[in-house]
Amino acid sequence: MAGFGLPNFGQLTEAFRKAQQIQQDAQALQEELDGMEIEGKNSDGRASVWLSGNQQPLRVRLDPALVQDGAEACETATLEALQAAYEQSTATMKGRMEELTGGLNLNLPGMGG
């Protein structure tokens, strides 16, 4: 089979083993990210938004003084806090995904790798 540019059976077996390990690790990572609570705050700290590691909204907290400033101030502060939480959450997810896949050599001869 090697004459057709295909990997040998041992390489395929190893690739499948790695794929199964990645799948198991990805499931564990999904559960870990779901359990995280990542807080983002606006610049003056009067609005906070919490997201999971998978960017699912969890809760919002607005300082009572911010609420007294009116709807527009609340909207602006909440959006700023949401953006901060989203940036932190996506950075966390990206970092954990890189940890998950970083040490794996998935290139196989004859398979475009």
Swiss-Prot record:
Molecular function in Gene Ontology: DNA binding
Keywords of the record: Cytoplasm, DNA-binding
Record-given protein name: Nucleoid-associated protein Syncc9902_0023
GO cellular component, one term: bacterial nucleoid
Main subcellular localisation: cytoplasm
InterPro entries assigned to the protein according to its UniProt record, in alphabetical order: YbaB-like_sf, YbaB/EbfC
Disulfide bonds: none
SUPFAM superfamilies: YbaB-like
SUBUNIT field: Homodimer.
HAMAP family tied to this protein: DNA_YbaB_EbfC
Role this protein plays: Binds to DNA and alters its conformation. May be involved in regulation of gene expression, nucleoid organization and DNA protection.
Entry's family note: Belongs to the YbaB/EbfC family.
PANTHER family, A to Z: NUCLEOID-ASSOCIATED PROTEIN YBAB
Pfam family for this entry, one: YbaB_DNA_bd
Annotated source species: Synechococcus sp. (strain CC9902)
Intracellular or extracellular location(s): Cytoplasm, Nucleoid
